[in-house]
């Protein structure tokens, strides 16, 4: 349930792209020339928005655009009912359903939404109805039943999730004590290393690589190392390969791995080997949660960085929204989502009462109270170390 915040944001959001209007207009006008005018009205308004937008731009009212979008949707509906067979029907239908979704979602727009435009990296121009606070929409779903129970091992801080998953202020929250003993895990925190953008250089990568190597050589076994991005993972991996010289076996997660490659990657943790296995992975990715490697299959996780989401227009919009309303903009947009990825990655190590292992947090920011206050109770005992 810890993923429900982001998933519900997307579920209750909608977006349109200016370029799609032009592409579909070229198709439809060949079969029904009269509909071209409605496309032109929409495109003209979107063009005005595009000219106003530099990085991204927030709007309070898009009533004029919605008027023409609804007229266009009505004419497209009639066109698709009459024209059941033409080569591009699938493309036109997908555009129509996306347009209908945008119109339907607009009816939900209130103070829990931000309407914004932005220029995409692929040079397309987007307008989005962004559900920054999904609590009201989720509460409507919850109210259809007698009760709802949300469960996750990483609901921290709990108030963050209570605020975003429901509008009610009297919901119960239960912190279940862990079934695992303190002796099963060792928590280490590196105080002389960081994944900050300003610190991402060769010397920092070498220090991180040294941590990884010393951890892997301290006890033979299988380890996962989690990074905040593919780019940094690759940079440290290359440094590690030069530093290690073949003392351990290292594998690395590839972007867009299919099911076959994913299974082959996980199978490495069940294979018998004479050396330590170090698996380089991306935090928040397919190996960062939802995998179950028990006992000797995994005896340690090294987590590089605080998991902060990449800076983007949407993250900046979230930060501005929650800063104005709660004075916690950075926490809600970056710190809390990032810490959840850290907790999920750390949770790969101890899966049963028979597991033992090490969790290593490599970022000096974990020593700050803003982060220590987000630690689970089981992390009260920890050792601070340097390379």
Residue ranges and their predicted role:
Residues 1-387:
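ASCE RecA-like P-loop NTPase motor cores
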């Amino acid at each position: 349930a810890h993923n429900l915040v982001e998933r519900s944001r997307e579920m209750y959001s909608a977006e349109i792209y200016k370029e799609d209007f032009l592409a579909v207009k070229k198709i439809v006008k060949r079969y029904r020339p009269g509909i071209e005018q409605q496309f032109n009205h929409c495109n003209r308004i979107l063009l005005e928005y595009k000219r106003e937008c530099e990085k991204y731009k927030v709007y309070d009212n898009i009533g004029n655009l919605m008027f023409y979008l609804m007229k266009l949707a009505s004419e497209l509906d009639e066109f698709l009912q009459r024209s059941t067979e033409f080569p591009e029907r699938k493309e036109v239908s997908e555009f129509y359903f996306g347009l209908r979704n945008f119109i339907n979602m607009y009816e939900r727009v209130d103070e829990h939404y931000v309407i914004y435009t932005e220029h995409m990296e692929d040079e397309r121009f987007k307008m989005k109805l962004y559900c920054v606070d999904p609590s009201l929409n989720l509460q409507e779903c919850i109210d259809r039943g007698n009760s709802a129970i949300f469960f996750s091992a990483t609901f921290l801080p709990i108030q963050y999730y209570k605020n975003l998953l429901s509008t009610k202020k009297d919901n119960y929250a239960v912190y279940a004590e862990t079934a695992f003993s303190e002796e099963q895990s060792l928590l280490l925190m590196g105080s002389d290393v960081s994944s900050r953008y300003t610190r991402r250089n060769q010397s920092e990568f070498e220090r991180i690589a040294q941590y990884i190597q010393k951890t892997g050589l301290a006890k033979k076994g299988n380890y996962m190392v989690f990074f905040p991005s593919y780019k940094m993972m690759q940079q440290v991996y290359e440094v590690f390969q030069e530093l290690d010289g073949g003392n351990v076996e290292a594998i690395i997660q590839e972007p867009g791995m299919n099911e076959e490659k994913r299974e082959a990657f996980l199978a490495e943790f069940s294979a018998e080997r004479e050396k330590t296995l170090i698996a380089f992975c991306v935090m928040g990715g397919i190996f960062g949660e939802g995998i179950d490697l028990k006992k000797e299959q995994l005896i340690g996780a090294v987590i590089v960085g605080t998991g902060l989401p990449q800076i983007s227009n949407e993250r900046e919009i979230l930060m501005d929204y929650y800063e104005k309303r709660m004075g916690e903009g950075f926490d809600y947009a970056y710190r809390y989502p990032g810490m959840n990825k850290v907790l999920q990655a750390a949770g790969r190590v101890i899966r049963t009462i028979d597991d033992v292992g090490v969790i290593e947090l490599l970022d000096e920011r974990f020593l700050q109270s803003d982060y220590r206050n987000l630690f689970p109770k089981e992390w009260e005992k920890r050792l601070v170390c340097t390379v």
